[in-house]
Structure formats: structure tokens, C-alpha cells
Amino acid sequence: GVNARHMGLEFEVKARPAKWVEISAMLSLGSWKWDSDSVVGYAYDGYGQALAVDPATKMTYITDPGAADHQYAIINMKGINVGGSAQTTANLGVTFKPFKGFRIGAEYTLYDRNYAYYSFSGSNLAIGKTMNLLQPWRIPTAGQLDMRASYHFQIGGLNATLSGNINNLLNQ
């Protein structure tokens, strides 16, 4: 099996310094690393059938899963960062309520220590060999500014809300 260790701390705070304003902040600090070495990956064809190779002819043939001749590769990945999600995230937001029913706000989110997602296939594994996984590419630090507004009102005795969002306002 492949194991990963996900450790970290998360903090979140919300304040209302005045009746008409809310401020929120969040910080998430993580350490996500693969915790496995000598992981065995078996070879299968596109139909999910276990593969073996005849040593004399080098021809591939179908075998039983887990049989002695079932082809495999070994992957060492202990201590390598898990990719696909920022391991440090921070957020600061503010919402204003200038009059009854109306809200307008913005929030900025910072993403750091984000590593590229990766996967394995037959093109990057050598059957019968050991592959030592290298650290994935660290994506540059990035941020995103989002804005939102909403107006809550009644129409014909029913509650209604008109709202809009602009995600990634700065197009970064």
C-alpha cells in the first residue's frame, strides 16, 4: 500500500469590529509527504489483465494476478511532497453591510507550497526495476482576489436574494 502523512495546523478567526463590517481570516499550514518506500506496482493491460514477459522471446502474455511471473515495478517515494493541493493557504476577507439587506465583500486567498500532481504509467516505470521518485515541481506562490455582493429583499411576500460574484478579479 501507499501511505501518506498529512499533518498541519489550521487557524480561523472572525471579528465584527462594528455592526456594519465583518472581518475573517484563515491560515492553514500543512506538511503532506508520502510515507512509503518499496511500493510494488503490478503491470496490467488496458483490459485489466495481469501481464508477464517470456524471458526467451521478450513477448508479453497474460498471467494470473500476483503470480510469480506477474511483472512489477518498485517505487520509492518516502519523504516526497504530496502534489495537487497547496500545503500553505492564507485568506483574509472583509464584508460590509452599508444598509439593510445589502452586503458587499472581498477576500484574498494566498496559495503556497503547492506541488505539481503526478501519476504513474507504463511510460515512466521500468518493469522489474526500482524507481526513486523525485520531488515534484513546486508551483510558484499565487493568490486570488474574489468579490461578492448580495441584496436580500421581499417580493410578493416571498424572500428573495439577488447575488453576484467575481472570482479571480485580478485574473492571476
Could you say what each language-model-derived stretch is?
Residues 75-77, 132, 164, 170:
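Residue-level signal for pocket-adjacent positions within structured domains
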Residues 79-81, 135-138:
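Outer-membrane beta-barrel domain signature
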Residues 1-120:
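Gram-negative outer-membrane beta-barrel transporters
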Residues 31, 109-126, 140, 144, ...:
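C-terminal beta-signal and adjacent terminal beta-strands/loops
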Residues 131-132, 138, 142:
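Aromatic-anchored helix/helix-loop segment that forms the rim or "lid"
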Residues 46-47, 125-132:
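Solvent-exposed, glycine/polar-rich loop segments of beta-barrel outer-membrane systems
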Residues 9, 74, 129, 161-162:
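Short, functionally important structural connectors and interaction interfaces within domains
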